[in-house]
Amino acid sequence: MYSAFSAHSLLNHGLYQSTMSLPDTPTPPRNLLIDREYVILIDTEGGMCRLHPQRFNAIDPIRHPFPGIVTNSVIVGEHFFVGTWVERDLSLARLALLDLREPIESGIEMSDLRVAVDAGKSNHHHVAGAVWSHILDAEPLAICEHDGDIVFCTHHRGIYRIGINSHEVWRRKPLGWDWLSDLPDGDVLVKLISVDDSIWAFSLGGGWVELDGSTGHVTRKGIHQFKSSTHDVWYGGDGNWLFSLSENRMAWWNSEAESISVANVSGPIQDACMVEETWFITGWRQDMRWSASQFHSEPDIGVRAEIGNKIVNRNEGGFWVLDNRGQWSDFVIQGISS
């Protein structure tokens, strides 16, 4: 469910130290999950470790519970990590839940898994240390938490809501949009986001749907004609959505005012959060600040040396950005525009 922590806020931790005092992550990041009690680093090879929630130093060694890259992940409830793993060459996919109160473990290596596949024993191997690990018959595409449960979708199979005990709450058939029927993979989902009592789903071709979180029924749906593919989506509250698009573009949509604006960027957006009606965005060697007063114009742009991977809002202390090397720096644009 959307909250202040959806914007990677660290208000309750009282952090005001400089990024100069923050250690590099032990390996280059693919994702960084931040919750009230946990900060989980997921690296580009599927390695995972916990970071200290205030100092951001590694408190565990890097482990590999999944045999490859973690494709989707989310922290669920107070203590649980849920992730997916896909190996297309082997036609394997897993969905697993880890208890973050327990040490993260390393599991089977890819070379050994290939041997198991050749021997017809791939089903004997699951995610190491998992409370549960399930075989999926289709590629998992997106995942989110909703009211303490797990919501995920798989390719052309549908959307599912399950509890942390893995019991099914509901499932629904795949979403579709008539206008996207002629667009290859136009209806393939790329993002699920929980907002209040709803779950929002976004597709590669610009389709969007608001689902009733308790039943999975469609509340409303539509299509954005971006003339670009949707790569990622962030929610900023009060109906504000930011889209990372192909063709070096991004879009700001307000679903309440039914207004939309598109801007050019230097490359893919990696992360974004909204504070005081202003988007703070990092990505391809640039940080951007896009305020409500600039809705129909270009955002402020600052150049950074590396690719920004994650933004952390430290409130009065400004913003930290974790780059693709695993190093921290300040958001390059200072202050909040009016």
Roles of regions detected by a PLM:
Residues M1-P29, H52-P61, G120-D137:
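A short helix->beta-strand "capping" segment at the edge of beta-propeller domains
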Residues D24-R36, H64-H79, G129-V131, I135-D147, ...:
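Repeated scaffold domains used in trafficking and secretory/extracellular systems
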Residues V39-R63:
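Beta-propeller domains
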Residues I40-I42, V82-G83, V151-C153, W200-F202, ...:
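Conserved beta-strand element within WD40/beta-propeller blades
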Residues E45-H52, R88-G107, R157-I162, G205-L211, ...:
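Structural motif
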Residues A58-H64, S106-A128, V169-W177, T219-Q225, ...:
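Beta-propeller fold detector
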Residues I59-V169:
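Long, mid-chain structured domain cores
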Residues H124-G129, I135, L141-E247, W252:
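Acidic, serine/threonine- and glycine-rich low-complexity intrinsically disordered segments
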